[in-house]
Amino acid sequence: METTASPVPSDLPRLSVVVAMVDPWPAAKACMESLVHQSPEESIEIIVADGNGNGLPAGGLPPRVRWHQKPGRSVFQLRALGFAAARGDIVASTEDHCKVAPDWCRSLLELHDLYPDAGGIGGAVENGADRSTLDWVHFLIANGPYMRPNRHHTTGTITGQANVSFKRKFLPPESREDGVLQMEMNRRLRDRGVELRMDDRLVVWHIQSLGLLGTCRMHFHTGRCIAGFRLPHLSTAGRLLRIASCAILPAFLAGRTAATVFKKKRCRFRLVRGLPFLALLVSCHTFGELIGYWFGAGDSPWKTR
């Protein structure tokens, strides 16, 4: 079911912002407030793909919002639904637990005008859950590579679903039945020769604090989802190689996180203080990938956030 708020300023918006929601309101309140308060003169639509059915309040919708209620869909399926529903020439994505900068939408449009050949532009992700060492380590593993500073340049790797945008003409015409894993989609665009860029003028804050058990579960389910999305493209030999690589995956993930932190000259003390959490979380992720390569994604796509 789709519900539409007041119409966007023009029949076809320039920018579509996709937000996949899996938790009930008010989990996405900060995200939605940061989006609906963007410059009113910009031609924007906000597409909420709601897998809970109660992701937005029951009253009137905020301006420029299209609300697709699809209870029971995974966050990956919801993201695919949002991309398919987008009408703007530029299609952006953020997460329901993120807060975007006040000039985010305007900057997106300006940067896509500035770089007409860029098919995708990723921005900076900063930590908005900064009260505990655990939350910092959780953030650094997944989003440390995208926190500021980032070089403003063409690159083979751009931000995931927290802060990324594409010219719609470069998006794949169809998505897999199990939805969109953003890192996989970015990689496939790169392999097609699509120009990808990073730019720190686009900033979002990632706000996620799940407690110790919840964070461990999140890293396990994320790992299992990654493996599950890879499986259809793996030969038997490739699958066995991925299973074997899990023996060194914890060291690789921990080393990559540490290298990022020390290269960017940020959060070094926080990471050193959180080394036990780092070891625990990369182990949870690795166990998730191992289970995923053996048995598939299972119900993990419905348990990620």
Task: List where the protein language model places each region.
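N-proximal low-complexity "stem/linker" segments adjacent to membrane-targeting elements
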Residues: 1-34
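Short, acidic, metal-binding catalytic loop of nucleotide-sugar glycosyltransferases
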Residues: 33-43
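Glycine-rich, basic loop-to-helix element that forms the pyrophosphate-binding segment
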Residues: 70-86, 184
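Short aromatic/hydrophobic "clamp" motif used to bind/position activated sugar donors
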Residues: 91
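Conserved donor NDP-sugar-binding/catalytic core segment of glycosyltransferases
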Residues: 103-134
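Short, flexible, basic/aromatic active-site loop/helix in glycosyltransferases
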Residues: 123, 138-157
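A short, conserved alpha-helix in the catalytic core of glycosyltransferases
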Residues: 164, 169-171, 178-209, 213
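Active-site-adjacent helix/loop segment of glycosyltransferases
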Residues: 205-281, 285
